Amino acid sequence: MRTDIYQSPLCERYASKEMQSIFSNDRKFTTWRELWIALAESEQELGLPISDEQIREMKSQISNIDYEKAKKYESELRHDVMAHVHTYGDACPNAAGIIHLGATSCYVGDNTDIILMQSALIQIKNLLLNAVEALSEFAMEYKGLPTLAYTHFQAAQPTTVGKRACLWMNDLLFDIEQLDFQLNNLKLLGCKGTTGTGASFLELFDGDEKKVELLEQKIAGKIGVSKCQSVSGQTYTRKADFAVLQVLSGIAQSASKFSSDIRLLSHLKEVDEPFEEKQIGSSAMAYKRNPMRSERIASLARYVICDLQNTAITASAQWFERTLDDSANKRLSVPEAFLATDAILNLYINVIRGLKVYPAVIKKHLDAELPFMATENILMYCVKNKGGDRQKLHEAIRKHSVKAAEQVKTYGKDNDLIERIKSDESFGLTESE
């Protein structure tokens, strides 16, 4: 591990090796070469003078990437794609002259971005499904455990611990729906040339538009992404990146809400997230048991939610058929959003699978608020069976509740709300009722 230069915490501390692999240099530049091979094969099939030997040579060198040579070429040429064209050509001297034939940089760059986002979305979906499974098991285990529900983080009415988990799960199911939509609608750029007109390929095929259309279809079939953009400039629309990161932002929102709930429940001592035997909560306060995993979820989620704005601004700032001010931003914003979301979901799964629930504390909190919660049923009963005026009884309950709460909060006394209502003649309740 290098210690003398900056290393991204997303890779060092948070994201899984699987997600890091998707956005690795090996995966990226191998995919470039796969695209160059698909282009050469398709051009050969449509009649261009490309030999089987040239294609075999390209395939044999697909993983033989001399990164030092590519770096040297790029320092001279100031162009990453051409640096790799030359590096690949040096490894395939017989095929060097037909590599990248008719293509522009975005043929490999943009198509690779779509392919990698597709793989990353599949990885994220698998994590979402694992999280939903964990929540489902948790919800079933605690479906019958009553707990105090909160609105405005003030005591409301009873729910169950399992029902509350269904709220978290429902958010993730919504995210899965959004992810599936984007995954099913991801489209390759295809091979449309420098401005999206396919001019270079029309030149190669002597103006045969049918062959140009077939070329794109063949490439898509070989790469395994069935759809291509019907219209583009030099790049695919950057709104596609925004749409994908909207999904990741949505997941981050769901996870952040979950983590906030766990942190609040932890403060109430109703649950604890997993805590290792030798884990330290505070360097100063040895007794502390902080919900640091949930806090980390919230922290990473904030990053992903904010990262969405990068893609929005990038999409809005593109000029005509293309401009390069998207490039540096995309290199950062898209992979890092996936890496952070991957980390968030792995933490989410870890927390819910190891969540410790304390039924005795939950019951204590519920019992303390039961008199207040009973008032809604009392109100309904008295209107229905006693002929009471709903508005007048509601006001009476409000006044009694304020006085009962004052006794609890100011003097530390027991909640006497039910006794106050029972002695109020306007309710007309008997002892047995």
Where are these regions (language model features)?
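Short amphipathic alpha-helical segments with heptad-repeat character
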Residues: Q118-K125, L129, S136, G162, ...
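A short, charged helix-loop
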Residues: L214-Q234
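Catalytic-core signal marking the mid-to-C-terminal active-site face
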Residues: R2-N25, E74, I280-E433
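Generic, well-ordered alpha-helical scaffold segments in large soluble proteins
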Residues: A38-S42, T87, A91, A134, ...
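A helix-coil-helix interface module used to build multimeric assemblies
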Residues: M1-A199, G207-A220, G281-S282, M292-R296, ...
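Glycine-rich anion/phosphate-binding loop at the beta-strand->alpha-helix junction
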Residues: D175, L179, S226, Q234-S327, ...
